[in-house]
Amino acid sequence: MHSISALLSLLGGLALSSAAPTQNITSDAYFYGQSPAVYPSPEGTGTGSWASAYEKAKAFVAQLTDDEKVNLTAGVSSKTGCSGFIAEIPRLNFTGLCVSDASNGLRGTDYVNGWSSGIHVGASWNRTLARDRAKYMGQEFHRKGVNLLLGPVVGPLGRVAEGGRNWEGFSNDPYLTGALVYETVQGVQSSGVGVSTKHYIGNEQETNRNPETVNGVDVASVSSNIDDKTIHELYLWPFQDAVLAGSVAIMCSYERINNSYACQNSKTLNGLLKTELGFQGYVITDWGAQHGGIASANAGLDMVMPETTLWGSNLTTAIANGTMEASRLDDMATRIIATWYQLNQDTDFPTPGVGMPASAQSEHQVVVGTAPDEKSTLLESAIEGHVLVKNTNNALPLQTPQLVSVFGYDAKVTDSFDLASTVLGTSPLFQNYTLWVGGGSGSNSPAYVIAPLNAIQQQAYEDGTSVLWDVSAQDPEVDPTSEACLVFINSFATEGYDRSALTDDYSDTLVTNVASKCNNTIVVVHNAGIRLVYNWIDHENVTAVVLAHLPGQDTGHALVDILYGRANPSGKLPYTIAKQASDYGSLLHPSEPQTPYGLFPQSDFSEGVYIDYRAFDKDNITPQFEFGFGLSYTTFAYSGLSIEKTNETTSEYPPSAAIQEGGNPRLWDDLVTVTAEVQNSGSVDGAEVAQLYVGIPNGPVRQLRGFDKVLLSAGETAQVSFSLNRRDLSTWNVEAQQWQLQSGTYQVYVGRSSRDLPLTGEFSI
C-alpha cells in the first residue's frame, strides 16, 4: 500500500529549494543520463511476416493528411465500452480501433466468459492449454469487435513477493513466463485480435507507480533501477518471446526505469525493443502513463491512451520547428496501420466495440461473445491451475463421503456483481466471497460463477449424500460425524496497491479453529499471489491443502472435479512459498520513498538476477514449497537421462545475422538436446510436468530451461525431450552487448521441481 502518512513525515524534512545531492534531491536533473539516450527512433522495416502489411500500411499512410496521422496516435472518447478508442477515417474505410482489457477475458460487458488468470495458467505449466485458452478468448474479443486485447502480462515478473499485480502474470521465472506468453500471443492473434504485451519494463510494484501530490509536494513515480545484465536475463526475456511470437503492440508502464519514465525511455523503447528485438508493432501507453510530449514521441512511443493533451497539434508544430522529424510521425502511423493489416482487420472485422455500450445497463445490441466449442477448454484451464501441496494419508480424492462440512467465506459467490465496478479497489467484493479473479483492470466479467459451495452441493445431490455449511463464522460448530471438513479462504490482490502481508489472521484462525474440531480438515486457498501457510500447514488435522489460485467462472466445477477424483491435480507452483515472510529478504515489500530520494522514489534491483527460487538457492534457504512443486494422486519415476550436443563448433557469440522479430535469429539455434524417461509408477492416470534446469558457469545454481507436461496412464512410460538453444545457455555480456556462451561445465538437472531433481548430468562448452 502507499505509505502516505510515512511519506508526509518524510516530506516534512525535505527542502523544496536546491539541495546538495548528499541531502534531499529536489530536481530530476540530478538523475539525467542514468538511462542512456538512444536516438533516433528506428522505423519499422516490415521484416519477415510483416512485409505485406507494411506495404499496404505505407500506401495507406501516404493518403493521410497530417491531422489524420496525428489522430491515429491518441485515443478519443467514444460511445462504446472499449477501454480506449482510435477514431475512424471513413473516407478510407478505416473503422477505428477498439482496445480493451483484459488478459483473462473481456471486461465491462456481457455475454463473455471469465477465464482463468495469468497465475493460474502459469501453475498449469501447459503450453498447449495456454494457446487454446488464448485462441478461444481471442475469438470472444473478435466477436465483440475488439481490435487489441490489453495483455498478456509479463511484467511484473514477481520480483516483490507482495506485488499487487503478480497474479496477472504467469510466473516468477522468465523462461516459464516467456514460454507461456509465446503461446498466448500466438493463440489470441490467430483469432484476428492483436495483443499488447505489458507492462514494459521493470514494472514490479504498485506502490508509487504514478506521480502523486502529497501535502502540496509533487512526488515522482518510483524508478526501477536495473543494470543491463539483469534487464536482459530477467525482465526483457519474456518480452523477447512475445516479440518473437509476433505481438503487435507492447504497452509501456507507469514507473521510471533508471529514472526515465517508461513511456519516454529511449533506451528501452528505441534501443532494446525496436532495435535489439526488431519489434515491428507499436508502443502504446498504459492509461495515463504519458509524462512528456515530443520527447516521448522521439523516444519511441507511438500511441497514447486513453487520450492526450501533450500531442495533437503539438506533433505537427514540432515537425514544423524541427524538434521532430516528419518521418517519426509517418512511422508511428505506419506501425499502427500495419498491425490492422497484419491481423486482416481490414476485411470482415466486426464494428469496433459492437454490443459494448459505455454503460452495460443501457439499451444495446446483443452480441454473444461466447461459443459452445470453448467450454471444455474453459473448464480444463480452470482445473489445471490448481496445485495440491499436501495430501496426508490420501485424504484426497474424496471417496463419496456421506457427510461433508463446508466452512469459510471463500466458499460462496458474491451477492451481486456490477460489470462496471471492477476497475480499482474491489477488495470488499471478495473479502466475504469466493475469489475467482483479482482486482483492477485485470479483472473480468464472467457469464456466471459456480462457487465451490454450489458445486459441492450439486455433487451431494448426485451422490445422494449430505452437506453441512457455515460460511460466515470464524469459529463454527462442527458435526463430529463429518467425514471431511473443507475450509475455504482466499488471499486477494489488486492493481493500484501492493499487498500488506502474505497471510491474514482471520483466515488462519478460521483454519485452526476448524482443524481443532475435525481430524480431516482440507484447506482450499484461492490466492492472487504467494500465500504463506506456516500457521497451520503442520497441524496434524490439516490433511490436505489445495492452492486454487484464480480459476475464473468455472471455479467450483473445477475444484469438485479435483476433490472427487474425476481430475487428477497436475499443477505446479510458478513461484516459491517461503516458510516465513522474512525469507524473501529485501524482496518481500515494495520499495518506499526514503531520504534523500523522497521526491523521487528509488527501487534498486541490486539483487540482480537472484529473485524467487534463484535467491533461495543462492542463500541456501529451505522453502516451505519450492518453485515447480506440486503433488498428484499418482507417482512418477524418472530415468534414462541423455545429453547430446548438436553443434560441436559453437562460437562464443552468435553469428551475425539481420535482425528479425525477436532479435538475432541465431539465438534460436539448438545446441544441446536433453532427453529422459518419465513413468507413471502409480495406479491412477495423471499428468506430470518434467522440468529441466541448467547450471550455467558463473551464474545461478540452476535456472529453468525446459519443461514438458505429459499425460500418462497408470504404468505408462514416455520420453520427454528438451532442446536448448543458444539464448538458453548464454549470459548477457554488458561490454560486448551480446549473448555470450560461457566456457566451462554446464550442470543439467531433470525432475519434478526445482529441488526434486533425481536426474543429473553435465556437458562442456
UniProtKB/Swiss-Prot annotation:
Reaction it catalyzes: Hydrolysis of terminal, non-reducing beta-D-glucosyl residues with release of beta-D-glucose
Pfam hit, one: Glyco_hydro_3_C
Active site: 286
Keyword 4Fe-4S: no
Gene3D superfamilies according to UniProt: Glycoside hydrolase family 3 C-terminal domain, Glycoside hydrolase, family 3, N-terminal domain, Immunoglobulins
Subcellular location: Secreted
Record keywords, A-Z: Carbohydrate metabolism, Cellulose degradation, Glycoprotein, Glycosidase, Hydrolase, Polysaccharide degradation, Secreted, Signal
Glycosylation sites: 24, 71, 93, 126, 258, 314, 321, 432, 519, 541, 647
A Gene Ontology biological process term: cellulose catabolic process
Pathway participation: Glycan metabolism; cellulose degradation
Gene Ontology terms: cellular component: extracellular region
GO MF annotations in UniProt: beta-glucosidase activity
Enzyme Commission no: 3.2.1.21
Domain of life assignment: Eukaryota
Signal peptide: 1-19
Broad class of where this protein is predominantly found: secreted
Function: Beta-glucosidases are one of a number of cellulolytic enzymes involved in the degradation of cellulosic biomass. Catalyzes the last step releasing glucose from the inhibitory cellobiose.
Family label: Belongs to the glycosyl hydrolase 3 family.
Protein name from the UniProt record: Probable beta-glucosidase M
